């Protein structure tokens, strides 16, 4: 179905708004993907904070003008599916990688993040990025580990001064119960 001018302007405005908020973009070739596969991918995209859209390349190209994804405009050729990560940079990569496992017709073509374009092989790198929660957990572990190690060292020194060997103290109750 052909779009009239006002509908095209709405699509461009919607995509431009999404592109301005997005962390990363993956354009993937989807020709040959079944309706069931596409529906499952769209459902998963909604659940993971990925905006997924099939749109004419000229409209997508106009929508990304003035955003960090403008660098990918020259590679927007052929039937493409656009996946914008709205919450986490790696979400679109994980979505496309997961969907491609069960669909050999789905192939990433362009990966854009931070104003740079990467080859399709970088989808795996993008997909392996930790989620926000995982990154915060890693940061918390890195920040608390020195304090934890210091506390263990102080406790070991105190235990050694109070009664000698900590391992021997732990073995005594086991011997009494036998």
From Swiss-Prot:
**Per its UniProt record, what SUPFAM superfamilies does this chain match?**
Ribosomal protein L10-like (SSF160369)
Which GO cellular component term is one of those annotated? ribonucleoprotein complex
| Pfam families according to UniProt | Ribosomal_L10 (PF00466)
In its UniProt record, a GO molecular function of this protein is: large ribosomal subunit rRNA binding
Q: Which GO terms describe its biological process?
A: translation
Q: Does the keyword Membrane apply?
A: no
For this UniProt record, the keywords arranged alphabetically read as follows:
Ribonucleoprotein, Ribosomal protein, RNA-binding, rRNA-binding
- Extract the InterPro entries matched here: Ribosomal_uL10, Ribosomal_uL10-like_sf, Ribosomal_uL10_bac, Ribosomal_uL10_bac_type
Assembly, in brief, is: Part of the ribosomal stalk of the 50S ribosomal subunit. The N-terminus interacts with L11 and the large rRNA to form the base of the stalk. The C-terminus forms an elongated spine to which L12 dimers bind in a sequential fashion forming a multimeric L10(L12)X complex.
The free-text function statement in the UniProt record for this protein reads: Forms part of the ribosomal stalk, playing a central role in the interaction of the ribosome with GTP-bound translation factors.
| Membership in a protein family | Belongs to the universal ribosomal protein uL10 family.
Official protein name in the record: Large ribosomal subunit protein uL10
- What organism is recorded for this protein? Stenotrophomonas maltophilia (strain R551-3)
